[in-house]
Each structure stands twice: as structure tokens, then as C-alpha cells.
Amino acid sequence: EESNKYEASRILQDVGNKTVVVNPPYPPMTQGELDRSFDLPYTRMPHPKYKGKRIPAFDMIKFSVNLHRGCFGGCAFCTISAHQGKFIVSRSKESILKEVKAITEMPDFKGYLSDLGGPSANMYAMRGKEEKICRRCKRPSCIHPKVCPNLNTDHRPLLDIYHSVDALPGIKKSFIGSGVRSVSYT
């Protein structure tokens, strides 16, 4: 239950003569903080210890762009909300386009983005209409068993990103390779 809260409490559990302490996660980043984290000088290359070996997982993500952090799906089998939180923090359009432009300049880029998504691709820019309601909420999922009436499910910001990326010089096609979740009221 604590992992579903915006501001969780520390959990203490006695085990024998010791106490296990689980500290609460940091609050979600701001968009500016997230953008700055993506502005760091990443090489987009595997660790040097692989010395030219093929890494199948790297092939899959080499030309991918992460649009946001977090997932409000609350799927029982998944740990994204435990690692990134259930509250979506999205990168700015400018930050995303800057990264895509950098990818188009990579020597082996052929014009195809393998994934323009995130933990759950279509949750970009979605959040509660009234944050104070979200801060009190303990539900593990904002979409199951029913979509929360406080959830903004507007896909237009995401569609704008898709159209803007596809219009860039050097982009032939972009794909959505990460999970798409149903966030509609139907």
C-alpha cells in the first residue's frame, strides 16, 4: 500500500532480533529534473567490457527514446511502479526532439526509431486532473478495475510528439516497442 502513495511512509518490520527498514521512494522528479537527467553526456553505447560483442538487448534499444517515467497500470506481475513510481513524469517535447536529432546523427542510424515510448508507451503527459486527489489515493492502479475519473487520459500531447518526431529530417519511421495500456473509458 505504501508504494502506491505520492508521499509514502517508512516501513519498519521486526525480524527476529533485527529490524528491516524500507525507506520511502523519493518524490517524482519534475519535468525539468527529468529533462536534465537526459541531457547528461550519455554515449548510447554498451559498456566497454563487452569489447565489440553483439548484445541482443542493446540491438533492441539502440535507437529508442524514453518519453517518460512511471506507470499507473498497477499490474500485479510488474515492478515498474516499484522502481519508477505510479505517477507519470514526462519529458518536454524539446528534450525528446533534441535526443531524436542526436540519434539521427549517429553513424549507423538508418532512419528507424525502434521505440518511441516509455514504461507504458501511451501514458505520456497523463496525470491526475487534481493533484491533491492523487496525493491521497492508495489505489495500485488508476485504470483497473475502472479508469479513475480524476485521470487525464488526453492522448493529444503524445500524438503531437509522434507527428513532430516523424517530421524530422532523417526519420523514416518510428515504432512503439513498449507496452500500450488501455486508458479509455469504453
Summary of predicted features, one role per range:
Residues 1-61:
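Flexible, acidic/Gly-rich N-terminal and inter-domain linker regions that tether
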Residues 104-135:
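Terminal amphipathic helices with adjacent charged low-complexity linkers/tails
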Residues 51-79, 112:
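N-terminal pre-triad scaffold of radical SAM enzymes
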Residues 185-186:
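Conserved small/polar residues in nucleotide/adenosyl-binding loops
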Residues 82, 127-141, 149:
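Short secondary-structure boundary/capping segments
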Residues 112, 173-175:
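Structural preference for beta-strand elements that scaffold enzyme active sites
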Residues 82-112, 163-164, 168:
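Conserved alpha-helical substructure of the radical SAM core
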Residues 93-100, 141-163:
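Phosphate/diphosphate-binding loops
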